[in-house]
Amino acid sequence: MSDQGVDQDIEPTALSLLTSTEAARRTNERRTAAIVPTGAVEQHGPHLPLNTDLLIAEAVAKEVAGSAEGVTAEPLAYGCSWHHTSFGGTVSVRTTTFISLVFDVCRSLSDSGFVPVLLNGHHGNKAPLQVALTDLAETGIRAYAFSYFDPLAGVLAEVFPEPSLSVGHACAMETSMIMHLRPELVKREAVPHGGTPPTWPDPHMFGGDNVSVVRPFEEINPTGVIGRPEEASAEKGEQLFQAAVARSSEAVAKILMETP
């Protein structure tokens, strides 16, 4: 059989590229995860593209879908980014809009027999995602969500000498991962230096106090950056990306083993 024939026999992992018959066969044959990348279109400093969160989440999701014999649904590109709207190019949706969209997408995937799994790349989406999962559960639909970066604490400690100062937003981690995935999109001459501003973490949020606050990002740092992007490298990005894929694949495998 020719290479062309082999390629034609392999179904794509992108849900939207399947036929309706192929999608139904997937869910009839086995419990199948439909992985929905969620991200944002928002400022990531002067050196990274606006779609940084989505770009990383999509790349991780594609790898995970392949290893888990799942599918990737179309990504939810716009997220909850109100705190970045003073920076050019940021596009934000209201939390209620985001929650409603997640609810409807997951309900449709569940109706088609898939296990909805939201693979998130933007911290601002985490709280709304939890609300959406609760709303879905109240209607009898079980969906799952996790952020690719949450399981990386141990790896970050290996890669960066002071991860609490190196990692935040448009930081050493994200810059490294984009250097690995899409190096042509990194404006290396514009990478800012100077580290995390002294106002972060918020000096009023004392250790042990569970206090929440939402502030515009320019109050934290007018450069749009938290962390030390100057510490980034493509090699570090590859290590972090592979770790994100491995940890995310483990999470999806555990999800699929759970009794529905």
Language-model region placement:
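Extended, histidine- and acidic-residue-enriched regions that form the cofactor-binding/catalytic faces
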Residues: 2-116, 123-260
